[in-house]
Structure formats: C-alpha cells, structure tokens
Amino acid sequence: MDEQSSGQDVDQSLDTLLKEIDLKMQLRDGEEGRRASAQSEGSLRLPAVRMLERGMVASASHKSVTFDEEPPSVHEYSVVMDSSAGTSECAEEEREGADGYECAADTMRVLYDEDTDSSCMGSERALAGPAAEGIVPEGYKEADLLGTERAGSGTPSLSYDDAAGLGSPPHVIFTIKPTSPLNAYDRGSWEPLQSNTAMDTPPRGGTAVSQHGLFAKAPKLPAIPSPNSRRRVSYAGSDSYPSDDSATDKRSLTDKTVPDNRGENERGGFGYENSDRNPSIETGTTDEYQSAGEYKSMSSSEANDDSKTEASVEDLRISNKPQRDTTIQDLHATTLPRSSSTLIPPALPPLDPSFFGRLARSPSYSPIRDRGSSEGSVGEHDSSLEQDHELGMGQQSARTNSSASGNSSDSVMVKPLSLFSNSQVDSLHLGAPAPDNSTPNKEALPSACPPDAMKSIGTQTSILEDKAESGPSQSSATSEKSVMLPNFPRFESFFDDSYPFGHDSDRSNNSVSYSKRTLKPSNYLSIWHLQEAQMRHDSPAFSANSQFSCKMVGESKRTSLESSRLSAKYESRFKFKFKPKLVSRRRIYYNKDQWRNFQEPPTRYYSNCTESDHISSDVPGTPVSPSIKSRNLCHGRTRGNMKMVERVNSLCSANERLSSAGNGDETFLSASSNLDVTSRRPSVDIISEISTKDLLPKIKQDSDGFNELIKTFVDHDEQSQQTDSTIASYRRGTRDTTIYHIWEHSIQENSISDYGNSPTAGKGTISKLLDNHEVEFDGKNSFVTGLGIIKKTDQDSRVDVLRIDSTQGIEAIQSFSPYSYRNAFDPVTPTKSAYHGCEALQASQMGTPFRPAISTTLQAQSGLGHKRPAVERPTTAQLGNYVSAEMSPEVQEPAEETKKRTDLQDNGQLYFVFVGIEQLALRDIERHSAECSIEFDNGNNVVQSEWLPLPKSGSMSLNQEYSVIIAEESLPNMIITLKCRYKSPKKELVEITEKVPLKSKCCGLGKPKYKQVKKLLRREMDFDEWDYKIAQDGSFARCKEQIDEELLKNVRYKKQQFRWTLLSEWERDHSKEHKRKRAWELPRLPAHPAGALVVDMCYLPRTSRFEKFPKTLQIARRVVNKFKEQKAIAMEGFMWQEGGDTEVLKRRYFTLNGTQLVAHHEITKKPKAMINLLRVEKLLTEAEISREMLSSSSRCFTDLVLLHECFVLFFENGEEIMFNPDTKTEKLEWIEKLRKVIELNRFHQPWVKKFLNSSENIL
C-alpha cells in the first residue's frame, strides 16, 4: 500500500507539472507565432512541443550554438520524460513489432532519482539499486557505449551522472538518437539529425562535448521525440497507445502557425523541405519520380537484428516541401510564354469553381507537392491522373466553358487531353466548341483527381491541335479566321509493364531495374499496403507524384496502429515475387508531319515597305492578321511575332506584284510563292533554295534596286539563322544537303545521330575551308640547339644534350620542327572508324598475338549474361577471356599485315648502339691528354655523349645507346661526328746530333777526328700538329649514313652490327710552302679516312597506336627475358571451377602453360575451354574476398562456407571465375604460379614475341 500511495503521489505531482508546462508552452508558442518572420534567420533554438493524452508526457527538440569554435558549432539534443516503468518491456516489444523501423526504445534507459523514497525503490532494486549505491549499472554502461559509437551520427549521449542531476521527475527517458515523429501531424516539425562526421565529433560540424557538459545545455522544459513506429507506453499499470486523432494533437496542430521557407505563415501546414534529398544518380530521373528502392535508410544500417531487412516508410523520402497552390498569376505566367511561339494571342481558360476554395489551405486537407511538379513544363502529363483514369477512379471529365459576354469573341472548351480519345482531340479547335460537350458541367473536378490536374487543364488550352487541312472556323461570334494550334505530343508510358517480355528498348541512361538487392518483393508489397493505409487519412506528407500513393477521399481515417497491423497482415499473407518494373523518364513522341512547320523557326524577311504596306491587301487567299487591339492580354514577344508575320505577308504581296510586272528575281519569287497560308510560315523548300546563294551579297548594276535590297537582307539573315535552321532540321531527323555542305557531320561532334552515321571532317575538308593556306614555319624556330646537362642511367657522368628524342632512357629537348605538327589536323575526338584494325586494342592495349577469342558455339552453350557480336571467322584480335579448345589453328594464329598502316603516329623506333672506335689517325695521344666524344645528329635533334679519355692505342669502347623515331614523312639522315679535346704541350723533345772530338794519339800531329752523338733536348714548340687536324669546335672526323628501306628490312626485329668509316674533313695543309700562313688561313686537305666506328642497329616497327617501346635495347632484352620466364611457368592438377563457360560447380583437370589455363574433362582429359590469363586483373583468396567484391549473380556466404579454400580470378570485363583445389598445399602452389603469371602480364607487347623468335637476335 505504501508503494502504491507513493506512486500515486508521484503521478499527481507529475500531472501538475505537466499542466504548468502545457500552459507555458502554449503562451510561448503564441509569442513565437507573432515573431515568426523576425526570428526566421537568427533563431538559435526552435523547440517543438507535443502534448499527448497518455504515455509519454512531453517532448522537445533543442538546438544550441557554441561560439567558442570557428565556425560556431550547432548542437541538437532532446530530453524525454515518462512515468512508465516498463521501458525494457517496451523496447523488447518494439524490436518484435516495429516491422523494421528504428525504435527509440533501443537507446532508452530509465534513470531513477536518488532522493526517491526507499519504499518505492524496494521492488525495483534490480535496476535502481546500483544507482543508489553509486555503482553504474550495466545498462548505463551500454548507453554510454552507444553514445560513443553513434557520436559520428550527430547525436550526443548522456551519462548516468548527468541523468541523476534531474532530481524532480522519478522516470526520465533520454533518447540517444531522435527518430521521426510518432504520428502524421508531427512529421513536419521534426528534422532527424543526420551527419557524416567521424567518431567523437559533435553534430553539425561542432566540437566534441563531454558527457558531463552536455546535460548542462539541456533546457528546463523536458520534451520527447515522436517516433515513426508504433510505441507502447505503460502508464498507471495499463497498456495504451497514442492516437493520431488525439484532441490535444489536433488542437496544437490547428493553433500553431509555422513559418515556411518562403517567409509566409501557413496555418496547419507542417511540410518542411528535406535538404538531404538528392536526385537519383543511378537512374538520372527527376525528384518527383523517385521510388522507394532508390533510397536506403540511414538508421537501418545501424540495426543488428532482423528489423534491418525491413524498409521504413520514411525510406521512401516522400518530399515534405511546403508548396503554394496554383494562383491566377501562376496560370498567367505558365500560359502566356508558352503560347507566344504560335503567333496567336492565347485565351485564358476559365477558372474552376472549386479553384477559389482550394486557395485557402485547411488543416485537414494539405497536399504537399514536390518542387519539381510545380516548376514543370506546361502541358506535362500527370502520371497520377492517367493512373486514376485507367483504374476507373476518374471517369468524370473536367469541362468548363467560359461564360459568353457582350464583347467576347472567343469561347474556350477545356478538357484534359489524357481523358480524350483521338477522335475527340482532332475535333477540338481554338474558338470552336466541341459538338457533344457544349453543356457546362457544374462538377469541376472529380474528388479523386489530384490537384496537379487543374494545372494541367489550365495550361493545355494553348497546345490544342492545329491541322493544316482543317476548314474555316465555325464560330459565329467573329468574322476573322482563327489559326488552329498543333497537336499535343504523345507521352510515353511511365511504366513499362511489358518488360521483360515486350520490346526491350535502349534505356541504359535513364532507367534501372529494381532487383532483389535493392528492394525485396516481400518488403515491396508490405510498403505498398502500408502506404495505401496511411494515405487513406489526410496527411501532410502526401505526395501526388509518388508511384505508390493513391489518394482516396471519402473513406474513414485509420490510426497508425491499424496501419501497422494491416501491413503486417498483408506481409504475412503475400510472399510471392513481383515482376520488376523499369521506372524512367517519359519520352515525348512528335508527329513529324504535323509539327514540321511548328518546330521550324520563322525565317525573318525585311523590306523597305511603309506602314501602309504592312497591312494585308485584299487579295483572295491572303491570311488575315489578328487585330492588336482585340488582343490586350498578349505578351510583348507575341506582338513582335505578329508584326513579323505582317511583314512577311506584305513581302508576299509585294513579290506577287513584282511577279505580275515581270521585273523580279525568278528564284526568289518561286521560293516566296511556296508560303504556307494556313501556318503563316515559309515552307522548308525555301531554306534549301536560299542556302544555295552566296554568303555575301553580289552587287549587280543592271538589276532593280529593290530586288538587290531584298536579296541582301535575305542572305544576311541566312547567315544568322543557319544554325537555328540546322538544329531544327536535326531535331526532325531530316538533313538538308545544301545546309550541311561544309562539314558533313552532325552539329555536336561527340553526339550520336538519330538518323544514321555521319562522316567526320577530314583533312581535305579542313584544307578546303582554309582556302589552301598552309601552315608556314619560321626557319629561326625550326631547329633549336640548346645545351643542357643530363646524367646517364648507369654512370654518374655528364652528357651534353642538344637535339635528340632520348638517350639512355631520358627524354631530351624537342625542337619546333615540322614533325611536331604531323598530327595537327587529326580529329579532336577520335572515332572508331578513324583507326582501322585497332578496335581490339581498346581494353588491354595489347597486340594481336596475345588476345584469345570466344567461340560462338561456346557462347551459346555457356549461357553467359553478356552477349558478344557473332563473327564469321574470329581472329586473335577479337578474343575474350576464354576460348574453346576445339577451334581451328588458323583462327588461333594472327594474320600477317600485307598493306601499310596509315593510321599510326609513326613507323616505330630504330635503336643505335655505338660499340666503339678503332684505328684513330692521331699520334702522341698520351702527351696531349686527349678526350673524345660522340655527337649524334638525326636531322631534327642533336645529342652529344660525355667525354671519355682516349687511350694510347687509339681504339676505345663507347657502349652508347640511342633511339630514333622513324616518321612517316621521310627517313632520317644520320650524321655521327667524333670530337676531341686536348692540351697542347708547351715544350717538345728534339733529337740533335753533336760532333764530339776525339783525342789524338800522336800528340797533336795529324788531323783531329770527331764522332757524332745524338741527344734529346726540350725546347719551345713552334706549332702543334693537332692544331691542323682538329677544328676549333673539336670536330675531328665524321660519317654520314642515309637510312633507307633496305637497311630497315635487314635490322627488323633483330640486332645487326655495322662498321662505318670516319672521314677527316677538317685537316689543313701545313707543308713548307704554306708555312708562313696562320692555321686558319691554310687550305683543307681532301677528306680521308681517320678511323672506324662500330655500330649495332635494331628496328622495331609499330603495329598499334597503343604499343609502347623501350628506351634502349638493354631494357628490351630484360622485357624479353621476363616474357621467357612467364612462358616457362607450367603446372597441372584437379580443381573445382564455377564461372566462365560453366555456371555450375564442376571438377576439371587444368594445365597451365604460360598465359593459357586449359580446362580438361575430369575423366577423358579432353580439352573443354582455354582461359586467357592476359585479361586477368587480380587474384584474391578467401581471406581477401568481401561481399562487395562479388557480383550479384554469385553466392556470397555459401561460397565462403562450402568453398573455404577457394580463390577467385577477376577479369577486365567484370567476369569472375572461382577455383577450389583439393588440398591446401595445391591451393598455395596454384596461387603462387598464377600470381606470377599475372604480374608478368605487363611485359606483353606486340613486338616482344617477334623479337624473341628472331634467330639472329643476341640476348
């Protein structure tokens, strides 16, 4: 009894507190409604309070701003008060009956006040005991853990100490993450917290907030969020459910005024714009035609139970944007601009009687439409109206006739085009009522018709049919002939119900098929019925453009409890699959015959006629222009078009008078006589005839001045209107040959023509446009000789680079030569036909010898999802991932190219290896400290090697490698120059002979005798012999070699050594007769041999635009060695295979030979298929495979369980083949071999195999 009495006291005190809160909130709401416009920009807290009769007492969502950071961070949180004690039971039942929706009870914890009476805490010692003793219970630890994990979602968590600070209420529930509103009326005022911040970051981009400091920001008034799902609350020992029809909710809904985003106050409109909604990236459709499968709930990914598989109604993302109803100004704005193109002032449709009643929005009926629907184009067909008409819900037609006034001359009959048959639409004319529908209908619109139908009805009056063959108008109210407007285009059906059994058109850009991965059929049906039940009562979240919604008026309202029970019942009854539908944009199909003149832009004609000539003459058959005074509501653009028509009419009359006089241009008059009187537009033949004239007017002295003026204006106008005319003819699918006489292709270079393939502009066409003006190159910039220092790859030595493409793998300086412009006139966007024979090199960029092909018989048996075009005799250039082993050998081998390729950027590369220099004609090399270098000139670029010491013998090794690109225009002329630098000795050794007297034996008697003695003496050098042999720039000898076709044929795919003679061309004659002259004045000797140069050459021709060549032959040797290593990899054994040519799991015998993995029959060992490992991108084991990497058609969890020792090969085209060896040892061995093959795939180029097979190649 004590516990019950204490509980009743607590309930009474709680009720008293709630009444005070209710009174304060109502007063505060009234003040906020009056200051709504002033606080729309700077409000820092927007509390929204909801009062329920039972269960949860009050709720509020609060926002606070922290100005300590830059920029200030916004924090949003909520506090919930509840008097029930069965929170754990509520959370358990919500997990079972919430149908997949996020339940707020998962994140709720009940906190107890430490000051509560001990008798009241006796029965609840299991929960409150630890809190009273200062021990944090496990529930609160879990709550803190949840708060830490969900910090990235933008929702703070509350600790146990913060909750203990409340004190006043006995039971307080804090929501870790606020959810959507409980009932339909709370949807608009609640915005769920969504953030993409990382863990431990505050919501909305703010700073981190501690758990103890967070509760200090909570407001004094507690509040609760309204969950979207059904909530059970235990209050005073009895189970009750909040009702949507609660009097408190309706009263708070009616009395509250919420400012919308346009700054207008609407009573009862609680639709807020969803800023997180984005257009569908997968389908490319507009916002108003999004379906449920295109969105995924943010909260559904956080759930770990069975409720994750169920989709929430909020996942449909039905727009809650506040929209204004259609007004008179909207009708004027949408009708007048659209009708201006018809040159006839439109007649405003009469307003529907119920239109003024719909201007005032009521709380019970508030259809919220998407922004895209209100801004749609005029005459856009409403899918919901068509659906209601097909279901028989909108059988009544909306017809309104304008009331006849005294001064009115036109009568308009308005009817939606979707409710008419073809014969009825053909009989409708502007200004003439229908014969059977002249009686006005007092019932303006069916109740089941959406409000968007009024917009469609009001704007479709300007697009009724206008036939050129129709007779004069039957209107008796006016004597003028009214021009009829063309037919409204036919729309494509929104749903393709015949898919996949009907015609499968191309919808790759704007459609998507919803499969089981995006939306399960069972959930699809449950969401369908749940929405149908929720839309039966008036809800502000109703969307007229939703494909699942069906507006039902006149039926009784149902509560959210009944809706959830109904969805559960339908979900349990119907478990069958549905046929997927294609949701896409609707296409408009135009009638080319009727819209030919309507889409053609009017050709403007001008003349020097006076104002009197603008008035139509009384010629029989001349069209009568409408009076401007009778069209006061016409737009300014329409008036201008009417004046232009009057000028055209006056021009026609003037030409007829000139034709009768016999002094006019016959070509122009014949074109002017073809004017269409009914449509008041010139026929298409006029454009083709006028376009044959010269672009500039020609002055003729013997012609009439008026005709010359006419032709001048016509020719000038044609230049300005040629683009518009070509675009119009392009849209109709008919091209005029006289207009497209220059470029001969469609307007947009990158577009695809709807009516056939058009050739692109080639070099001949562009040359014709340039009027034979060729590009001239300045001789000063043709050859640039710049000196730079680079380093070799193998030695740290200096190389002087002048003009060469590359040396030792390093790019050199390029010059502004004519070869730089050899591709100047290539098309900007290459087409498939521009490169003949290279279609197979798009994906892997590999040559023909290494691309296996798929057999047509294998494709028919395998039943693969992708289809390839069948060829009569496939070559290896058209191969896929695997081929049949039964193919003929001639298919496997590539065909030799017999004709010369003309679509390549060059003809390949020629490699030079300077082996060394032999037998130099230089003496005394050691005393001169000589060094030499090689200068290599290919005619465009020059490169010089580093300086190397010249040995005493006169022979040295160089080992220098160079590459030259062989262009298509001409073959290079090679010039190799040997340069030397030395130090002239200051003194020289001279041998002299001296006479040394001998002693006489005869004491001075006789003749004295002498002997000659040779001696070496050092003396100053008079001249140095090297000064007369070496030029001042160091040039000593050179050789010239012309590269011809015969030489390239001898070194094709093989290396061959040559010995070139070096000729001395700079040595001067220093004989005695020229001894007195200076060195530079001496004559030069004839060229004579001074040494020999040993060169190795190799030529690699180009066979593909995507072929890559190595920089040097040394790199080419390493590539060939890697290719040989890959070719030598071999292995065989049994494995299980799934994918490729078999869709089921099969055990086969596999043999690996290089890049070919051949599958044999398990018993007979007969070859079944060959898998091309060149197309493999990666190999992954079971530890590396995740569910995202596997395709939708393959199994995920089952493969990992049953085939735990498997590995998967992923190909370039997205195909996957799974293999499972018998043992783990074999699996590791297969993985090692296959990964080695995949790594060596990068060394595959078309030249590698031919370079390897060359018998004379030295590796």
Swiss-Prot record:
Question: Could you tell me the keywords of this UniProt record?
Answer: Cell cycle, Cell division
Q: Where is the composition biased (Polar residues)?
A: 277-289
The free-text function statement in the UniProt record for this protein reads: May be involved in the septin organization at the site of septation.
Please verify whether the record's keywords include Cell division: yes
Where does this protein chiefly localize? other
Q: Which family does it belong to?
A: Belongs to the BUD4 family.
Q: Cite the record's Low complexity compositional bias ranges.
A: 397-411
Organism source for this protein? Eremothecium gossypii (strain ATCC 10895 / CBS 109.51 / FGSC 9923 / NRRL Y-1056) (Yeast)
Do you know which Pfam families this protein is assigned to?
PH (PF00169)
- Give compartment(s): Cell septum
Q: Which residues form the PH domain?
A: 1128-1239
One GO biological process term = axial cellular bud site selection
Composition-biased stretches, type Basic and acidic residues, lie in: 247-267, 305-324, 368-391
MF terms from GO for this chain are:
GTP binding
One Gene Ontology term, aspect cellular component:
cellular bud neck contractile ring
Segments carrying the region annotation (Disordered) are: 185-416, 428-455, 862-902
**UniProt protein name:** Bud site selection protein 4 homolog
| PROSITE patterns, per database record | PH_DOMAIN
Asked if the Swiss-Prot or TrEMBL record annotates the protein with the keyword Nuclease, the reply is no
